[in-house]
Amino acid sequence: MSLQTASKVWKGSTTSNALGMFGTGFLVLGILGMAVSFASDVKHFWHAYLVMFMFLLSLGLGALFYLALEYLVGAYWSVPIRRVTEGVAGLLIPVAFLSIPIFMGGMDHLYSHWIPHHAHHAEGHAHHGEEHDKHKAKVDKYQKSDSNTYSDKAKDHKHKSSDAYGGHHEPDPIVEGKRPFLSKPWFYVLNIGCFLIWIAFFYWFRNNSREQDKDGSQKYTQRNVIMSAPFMLVFAATLTIAAIYYMMSLEPHWFSTMFGIYYFAGTLVSAASILTILVITLHQNGFLHSQMKKDTYYSLGLMMFAFNVFWAYISFSQFMLIWYANLYEETMWFIYRYEGGWATVSWFLILFHFVIPFFALLSRDQKTNPSRLIFMAYWLLAAHILDLYWIIVPTYAETSFQLSDLGFLIFAAGFVMFFFNSGVKGANLVPIKDPKLEHGLEFKIH
């Protein structure tokens, strides 16, 4: 069978049309659910929106990293599934538009603790006083339980980070020290710049890949290889900037030099998981090359396993370093996540995100069983969402989930279905004239 005729055409297929329709339906249902959330609790709405935004961003960034990594290391096994990776990386374009609501309306609710007083909405002042009282109670509790550790530091940090610009308090010196970085203009410029860089690299990699379908020239591969190395350096910087601005700045008193790589580890897990779901589903329905072996499934399962272990390693390392240093500014971040219902979530996250997936993906048989791989891929996507929820929501709430949060999950599912389908319509789902395709199809695990 010819390498160029061994898969179905995606564009115009029944599956493509169905995916587009389901995606549209899920988007509509998700918007309705999000509207209910906005009407019931504006503050919670914006924090749940940020969770959804960072989740969708992680899918696109992780796929873009895998795309560049393939060229950088000269991988063969991933060539037959490259168009799927390109389709997921293409989510970065519509995700960029999801940042606009945060810029226009969400910042005053999410980052009011470092936005100057004149930029606040009126209702923010009452919230600051409430946050101050909650934080003071926590400080008093931990001062009493470990006065030698916290008493001196607590005197200098009487207010929670979100009280930095409260209506009745002086500007916070810690926030003021970070003022050149924590400002709306820099937030806009740096984050818009990050998206422009990511999208520019994405178009470079994808366009060269698609141009190769016309004449099979090796020059297109070489162009991407040359660009992949500098991309890695730029990617590390821009991803860290995004993680700091969107999530770490929710609590500007807290800082961690490992936070960027912590989010990066999550993007690798989530992107590997969504790629596993899409690749297996498309292959089983005849849209990827028929000669592709289950060894490709094994590689995807290995990526999920390895990068999830990497996530656990980074998570534990960050916790251990903060626990060992025992600095008030750092430890309070974990204390907030061990208060109220968040203590249960914290322990559950360890089990749900690491322990169970570790044993479920440990054996070779598990990594070559399509149905089990898809199940674990969905599991890890849910674990990544929980991780983001655990990072973001405790910054303002002592309780966790709300029923209206389902609207954000439905919207995210529809978003992926609709825009992935739209993004891969313009080309073959297999890079039919890539010189490495045949080697990729012959790939076997030894």
Question: At which residue positions do the language-model features occur?
Answer:
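N-terminal regions that are enriched for targeting/export leaders
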Residues: 1-60, 157-160, 179, 426, ...
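Juxtamembrane membrane-water interface segments of multi-pass membrane proteins
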Residues: 2-18, 36-42, 66-89, 102-116, ...
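Long, contiguous internal "core" modules enriched in hydrophobic/ aromatic residues
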Residues: 16-31, 123-134, 138, 148, ...
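Hydrophobic core of alpha-helical transmembrane segments in multi-pass integral membrane proteins
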Residues: 20-39, 99, 236-239, 354-358, ...
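Transmembrane-helix bundle segments that line or gate the permeation/cavity pathway
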Residues: 46, 58-146, 150-160, 164-213, ...
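Hydrophobic cores of alpha-helical transmembrane segments in multi-pass inner/ER membrane proteins
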Residues: 59-66, 97-98, 191-202, 265-280, ...
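Aromatic-anchored segments of alpha-helical transmembrane domains
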Residues: 237-241, 378-389
